[in-house]
Amino acid sequence: VVQESVLGEYVNNVKAGRFEPKIGTSEGPKSPYQITLWNGHDKKNHSWGMVIDLNSCTGCGSCLVSCQAENNVAVVGKAEVARAREMHWIRIDRYYSSDAPHEQGYSISGFKAMEEASENPEVVFQPMMCQHCSNAPCETVCPVLATTHSSEGLNQMTYNRCVGTRYCANNCPYKVRRFNWFKYFENDNFDYNMNNDLGRMVLNPDVTVRSRGVIEKCSMCVQRIQAGKLNAKKERRRPVDGEIQTACSQSCPTNAITFGDMLDENSAISKLLSVEKEGRAFHVLEEINVQPQISYLAKIRNKDEAKKKAEGAAHAEHKEHA
């Protein structure tokens, strides 16, 4: 899920720390991307995507808060979160390192040893939202076609079709779909600020307020994409790179999230992927070949330099006491 390496190894090999799965076939091991049951999507106009740099993400949660505000995501409170009924469209996954040795590989005993916490654990933050998969497992199981794929690479929801079977949430490998157990707005049990005329003014009029019994998820701020495209159309031009930003990418204080059109060769995301495609760029759970629109850049730790600094500080302290 998270891929990382140290600076010394990365300098010698830009793919250090990368996990590249292979699937056994009659023709020998192949990359999952070479094996598929589905025809590819013909994206002629735009292909929206994101690149998230794990080196830059500090886990501050700005993306989460801005997403809540932009997309009218309900604030359900501690009691509902304790029942695993949180409604965030984006979550910050947090992973800790272990002191377990790697000799046991991927055996069950090896994973048991990894449960032992490190004395000084390292942490990785990973923003996780709908990956907008081209081979989306959620789309194939919906009996009413409430979740479909757009011609621009977005996995989209049609709320008035959804009947709440939750098959899509069950089939999502990233677990990023949220079910409305209640009508959260205009409900005295949740978010009191939304129950009066003044409080409702904070709602974004460009985003549908979901009703009870439907699934919702990250839309990649499709309302902003459509507004940007319409503004460009009025001026008889294509959208300029950076003109359209999702709420999460706009609010990120470290610019860890890069959003843009991957079909635009001059866009920041295309330039970044052209450099990192054979380097740090990876997809989460590549082995299941769902072909996400969201890529991550592996985390590179400067362990060697940190160790040298610590040793230098210890030596200086010892010399001072001597």
Q: Which residues make up each language-model segment?
A:
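Non-ligating segments of multi-cofactor redox enzymes
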Residues: 1-322
